[in-house]
């Protein structure tokens, strides 16, 4: 299949344009609905079915009193036994592989540097698109950490030719703007903090307001342009109507294209982007998919840029993927030992998802030096899960009050009043926080204990509030529920504690933009809670947890049905996503994108797990496949 040529094929708007969609279809795509339809391009396996009803069991009071009736949810057990994890090994940690990777890195840098130096191959008609293609490919392959300087130089060059009302052409001397180049530039420049307006997309509409391309373009070139238009539309800011129109139109167009074109690297890219978009996309999963899609299509058909060595990029990407895989196994073995030796494995009433949490962490950050971030993320998520199950089901009201008070006193002597199962959890939490504080002092240069303690106390207060609601069968208003639920989701603590261990300076003015009570934190927490509720409210209700965004909305709106509540909440999530884009990428921010990106990516990881169902509670087929493809299975070199 012919892909986009590096030679500019633009024509004026007044000459030879063909609409990309019929007039009737435009009305359907742009006017009837303002929400992108659910996109499920791949056939998935039958989901793992779990009975989520409560079981009531009898426990003897630790103090020698009567028998306590406890509620236990029927969570499935850990799927990844410690013996299995400890048996895993990888040859890719050897020096020979890292040395090969270092050699290829230098060769790819030479490719980058050849773009401005080789005027014969990369002339004034293709130099902008070539740079954008190179940056985009390197980032999607997960190897961009080696080329930060080259990426910045390339994007500075592209931005110098950006026109606010027209965008760019394929090259600096192109006569007319090009949709493919402009859409790719809009997305890439925006994600790197450049101030670019989506208004440029208005240029690529015909007289009727429909998106259009020059009639001279091939179907493959048009499809590539629409694909990059769709990708650009996903980084929309609030109020950008043209981006909403672009998203609806391009999603519809690409779905129809998939029904016609043969299997190829282009069809594979389209399937992946429609499946995961931007806000449920995980960098490591994308890297593996991008590698496999391009290899399966054959090297002879994969190269949009015939003068760039895609084979060399894939060679480096595969080496990097497998070298990190070796580190992943070592870190995962350490986490599994921690889970077993801490006694967590003996807590039969709770969910055990430490392997899944590690998968999320390593899909967020693939930098070898961020080991502390990954380990901290897993431990925090595991502990929040255990505590959530204690407060929602297993613990009695008296025990929960004792535990909450003990946390606020932050004194090990208070554990003597706790039941045995709570003592171990308290000690694990105490140790986890102190280890993080010690690590954070190295990276942040100050004592963060009080800051972290306050965050945990706020979490426990909301846990306690929800326990009271369950105990009294109280159903709050939607506003009352969401105010509490944004904190009880655990999003703040699951983000704050890991990012403080990064080698990214987070002075107070940056934390004020990321952490509570910032708008960034509120949006991230809302997305997690609302998306989670849409996926697990029925299972929660079966466990006796009546309060959810769905049930509270229906209480506030008598006569409404679940579908009404879900539509309202999904609209809230869509709005929050665009606003979170703004908080991450806003050009007027005092905080660099790099200081906010890990917090943003944690939100993406949780959103990914909740994409189709509650993969956080139930390790369904999508979750298990994610573990296999991004952690356990290396690529064939």
From Swiss-Prot:
Q: In which pathway does it act?
A: Terpene metabolism; oleoresin biosynthesis
Induction remark: By wounding.
- The residues that hold Mg(2+) 3 are 540
Q: What is its EC number?
A: 4.2.3.16
Q: Name one GO cellular component term.
A: chloroplast
Q: Where is the transit peptide?
A: 1-56
- What Pfam families does UniProt report for this protein, alphabetically? Terpene_synth (PF01397), Terpene_synth_C (PF03936)
Tell me where the transmembrane regions lie: none
Protein residues bound to Mg(2+) 2: 388, 392
The record's family statement is:
Belongs to the terpene synthase family. Tpsd subfamily.
UniProt protein name? Limonene synthase, chloroplastic
Whichever gene encodes this chain, its name is ag10
